[in-house]
Amino acid sequence: MATERQYSPLDRLLLQADSAMRTLLPSSAHSQRPSPAVVQPEHKMSEADTRHVAGLMRINHTGEVCAQALYQGQALTAKLPKVRKAMERAAEEEIDHLVWCEQRIHQLGSHTSVLNPLFYSLSFGMGAVAGVISDRVSLGFVAATEDQVCKHLAEHLEQLPTEDGKSRAILQQMLSDEEHHAESALEAGGFRFPAPVKFGMSVLAKVMTKSTYRI
């Protein structure tokens, strides 16, 4: 029976550095699943609608950058191996979303946010701190974060132009995946954060969405 490889602290730091580079460097990550947008036709939109959709997708891309950093930070400090594995697996699944959003942004003739390195660093730090406190808090933080992401996705789906089936297909699949991640974190023993904490997280999320819509 094969034994699981044991990584040293240096190994884990190098793996985190590799993950950060794949997350932040353009076109360096690769999805496991094809984008839901590939089966949708491209319909012409007005210039204003195209700019607006690009801004929404840029927000969602940065949200996935934050998710990657959050999971990687938690995986670095998680106490139980099964929790660490769960965080690493969730990060891998989020890569699909990251790639899909980046592809759509480029199709719309726009760019990803220049603020991504800043938000990656902040999210990684918060994830690592949550992991140090306890695995229950770490899992609860995942659930609360995914709840915020789901709210943004639902709002963005309402704002999309009717003719933009490509972006809609991507966001619908992302919403389904994120709801599953939130449920899984709670089922694994995650702590349900109280309303004041969730409110504070929503304020931070608004800072991210307002700043990355254009830059």
Curated annotation (Swiss-Prot):
Family per similarity comment: Belongs to the COQ7 family.
Class of this enzyme: oxidoreductase
UniProt source species: Pseudomonas syringae pv. syringae (strain B728a)
Essential cofactor(s): Fe cation
Keyword annotations: Cell membrane, Iron, Membrane, Metal-binding, Monooxygenase, Oxidoreductase, Ubiquinone biosynthesis
Binding, Fe cation 2: E94, E146, E178, H181
Cofactor binding: number and manner: Binds 2 iron ions per subunit.
Membrane topology: Peripheral membrane protein
UniProt keyword Cell cycle, yes or no: no
Purpose: Catalyzes the hydroxylation of 2-nonaprenyl-3-methyl-6-methoxy-1,4-benzoquinol during ubiquinone biosynthesis.
InterPro entries: COQ7_proteobact (IPR047809), Ferritin-like (IPR012347), Ferritin-like_SF (IPR009078), Ubq_synth_Coq7 (IPR011566)
The keyword Transferase is annotated on this UniProt entry: no
Superkingdom as given in the UniProt entry: Bacteria
EC number: 1.14.99.60
Intracellular or extracellular location(s): Cell membrane
Any single Gene Ontology cellular-component annotation: plasma membrane
Protein name per UniProt: 3-demethoxyubiquinol 3-hydroxylase
Known catalytic reactions: a 5-methoxy-2-methyl-3-(all-trans-polyprenyl)benzene-1,4-diol + AH2 + O2 = a 3-demethylubiquinol + A + H2O
